[in-house]
A protein has these predicted regions:
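Membrane-proximal helix-turn-helix segments that form the acceptor-binding/catalytic region
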Residues: 137-155
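Conserved donor-binding/catalytic core segment of Leloir-type glycosyltransferases
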Residues: 5-7, 156, 183, 191-210, ...
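Short hydrophobic beta-strand element within catalytic cores of glycosyltransferases
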Residues: 299-303
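Short alpha-helical donor nucleotide-sugar binding micro-motif in glycosyltransferases
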Residues: 261-262, 269-274
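Glycosyltransferase donor-sugar binding loop
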Residues: 42-46, 203, 227-244, 258-261
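N-terminal subdomain of nucleotide-sugar transferases
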Residues: 1-55
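Aromatic "clamp/platform" in nucleotide-sugar-dependent glycosyltransferases that forms part
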Residues: 282
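A charged, aromatic-enriched C-terminal amphipathic alpha-helix characteristic of glycosyltransferases
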Residues: 336-371
Length: 372
């Protein structure tokens, strides 16, 4: 069985980094009979000073379908990394992200001449993502190109937009696979919408890229009763405090709740009581929470900066320009929708997931990417 070595900044039981953790965990669990996975990661969660609970540090251990080692900072040294990689002798090395020194830049530098490297950019080359700390990122990418660090690597992209971003920022002379991220197995939930209260939900890290303030300000224009639940780790405290101020100024017909980070089992409970999922993100390369919502039969309202097309065609929701008028119109539309019409969106959302995102569709593609 071929061995695949994965480098990632954070891995389960870490949760705060969101999508990338889920992507890797689900990918590994999709292919336990095809490949032997090894994961090198850190001992902490995102922005945390404490080590993860329940893990042994600096020693290999079985986590789900993977062999995982949680390395302390003092162990993230060239000599130790070279020793670990030589011990495994992987067929492929899979790197997550672009800008992490210890878990992307350094492994690429150390191992690209001897091992086959796959890089998953995780949306970091999108224009919205590059706009944050843009000068530093542009200088870094220019240096990487000038030293030909990315020459001969294989890129794992999740959609055509990521390919456009990669061609624009890195090179048009690349090899790549376009495969959506793997999602968890999620049961369909038959939903009924009978009341005039519209329950909305967002699941995301609380930072400026997610444009939560856009939607909160929009809610001040809504006249009907609306409950809005926002689940996710607070990554930017100043931004979060500004969101609280906006929430406090909203009219009495609007209720907003920030729950903080939640376990996946708890998130599915929140999804069951929602009528519409909301994402106003300024940059999204996949959007696990969008896909998981569709899988449960929850229609989505997302910005055109998210990758999922043809939602309206399949009665799965709407992909909209990031302007108040478009989102407001669709909120009113869902609020006034009859139970029968809503059931059509309920079924359409799951059908969209099964047609375009269900992991069983792309399993062969993942096997090919890791085998060749």
């Amino acid at each position: 069985m071929k061995k695949i070595l994965i480098f990632i900044d954070w891995f389960t039981p870490a949760v705060k980094a969101g999508g990338p953790i889920s992507s890797v965990e689900n990918m590994v669990n999709l292919l336990p009979k095809e490949f032997e996975f090894y994961i090198i990661t850190s001992t902490k969660d995102l922005n945390s000073k404490q080590n993860l609970d329940g893990v042994v540090l600096n020693k290999w251990q079985k986590v789900g379908s993977a062999n995982v080692i949680y390395l302390e900072k003092s162990h993230l040294k060239n000599k130790i990394l070279k020793s670990l990689v030589a011990e495994i002798n992987p067929f492929k090395i899979y790197l997550n992200g672009i800008f992490s020194f210890k878990f992307s830049i350094l492994p690429c530098w150390l191992f690209k001449t001897k091992y086959n490297i796959i890089i998953a950019p995780r949306g970091m080359l999108g224009s919205g993502a590059l706009a944050v700390k843009s000068y530093r990122k542009i200088v870094f990418l220019q240096l990487m190109k000038s030293f030909s660090i990315y020459k001969n690597v294989h890129w794992h992209l999740t959609n055509d937009q990521e390919l456009e971003d990669l061609n624009r920022v890195i090179s048009k002379n690349i090899t790549y696979s376009i495969l959506p991220n793997v999602t968890k197995k999620i049961e369909f939930k038959e939903r009924k919408k009978s009341s005039k209260i519209l329950n909305l939900i967002s699941i995301c890290r609380i930072n400026k890229i997610k444009k939560i303030e856009f939607f909160l300000r929009l809610l001040s224009e809504i006249k009907f009763e609306c409950n809005y639940t926002i689940i996710g780790f607070v990554e930017d405290l100043n931004y979060y405090n500004s969101l609280l101020k906006i929430s406090e100024s909203l009219p009495s017909n609007i209720t907003v709740e920030f729950t903080g980070q939640q376990k996946f089992s708890k998130i599915t409970d929140y999804l069951k009581s929602a009528h519409v999922f909301i994402s106003t993100s300024n940059n999204e390369n996949f959007g696990h929470s969008i896909v998981e919502s569709l899988a449960t039969g929850l229609p989505v309202l997302i910005s055109e900066n998210c990758p999922w097309n043809n939602l309206e065609k399949y009665n799965a929701g709407f992909r909209l320009p990031l302007t108040h008028s478009y989102f407001k119109e669709k909120l009113i539309y869902f609020n006034e929708m009859s139970p029968r019409s809503y059931m059509g969106f309920n079924n359409g959302s799951r059908n969209y997931y099964d047609k375009f995102v269900n992991p069983s569709i792309f399993k062969k593609g993942y096997i090919k990417m890791f085998s060749e």
